């Protein structure tokens, strides 16, 4: 019953992986139907998507969607391929938000995208990946349109790194948040290691404090991943309990959503 068997015409090979082609309307509907089935059958709190839309580029090889793009153009479509790919993802995100809330309006919908919208945005920020032109994810647009209940940008850099400054990036995402959705940045907790690592426990502590100062109404953050906390790598669990997790956290209320029935 796997999609690579039942829906062979929806799947393409890119590198060593099989991908459902977002340019195929049936592929998008298939994914939405799977999510809708989970929402309807199970008592879930939310639907969370990670940072995979179109795949991360593999060298100079382009994603193999010539057939679906040709069908779009033959049908009268006018968008260039980049804008067409973004429109496919935009439509999926919008449809997902509406579909989930049509069934259970209290279920949260959130996405954790790559933490930098584009290289040079905001000014001075550097990135080896342009998610707008590489993953075809126009994340600021999703925020502006209110197609998310929370956004968890993967801010996996320290506060004092000029090229990818945690605070500068967090401020940027808050500035895009005209609908007042929750902004809960992802922290790179998994990079903490006993005996050293790319991230120190004090850095996480400072980032958590910063997120609380920036948003006193709906503060929050997400750890990637819980493994370091559970293993208390470099005593991070104990330090956070002592310095920033001193009280039980209440589940946030998202005021634009109804209460669970």
For each feature predicted by the language model, list its residue ranges.
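Substrate-binding cleft of secreted/luminal carbohydrate-active enzymes
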Residues: 136-162, 174-260
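Glycoside hydrolase catalytic-domain groove-lining segments
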Residues: 62-124, 129-195
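Secondary-structure boundary elements
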Residues: 36-50, 98-105
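Active-site-adjacent "subsite" loops/lids of carbohydrate-active enzymes
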Residues: 1-41, 134
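Active-site-proximal loop/short-helix segments
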Residues: 1, 6-9, 41-80
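Short, solvent-exposed turn/loop segments enriched in Gly/Ser/Thr/Pro and often Arg
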Residues: 50-56, 113-116, 227
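Active-site mouth loops of central-metabolism enzymes
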Residues: 16-30, 122-133, 194-202
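Short beta-strand segments at enzyme active-site cores
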Residues: 46-50, 109-112, 223
